[in-house]
Curated annotation (Swiss-Prot):
UniProt-recorded name of the protein: Temporin-1Tc
Signal peptide segment: none
DNA-binding keyword on record: no
Native organism: Rana temporaria
Localization of this protein: Secreted
Residue list for modification Leucine amide: 13
Tissue specificity field: Expressed by the skin glands.
Family under the similarity heading: Belongs to the frog skin active peptide (FSAP) family. Temporin subfamily.
GO biological process, one term: innate immune response
The entry's keywords: Amidation, Amphibian defense peptide, Antibiotic, Antimicrobial, Immunity, Innate immunity, Secreted
Lineage, top ranks: Eukaryota, Metazoa, Chordata, Craniata, Vertebrata
Function text: Has antibacterial activity against Gram-positive bacteria.
Length: 13
């Protein structure tokens, strides 16, 4: 769950 959340945040940023 941590990696996917990081990926979503990175996509937004």
């Amino acid at each position: 769950l941590l990696p996917i959340l990081g990926n979503l945040l990175n996509g937004l940023l």
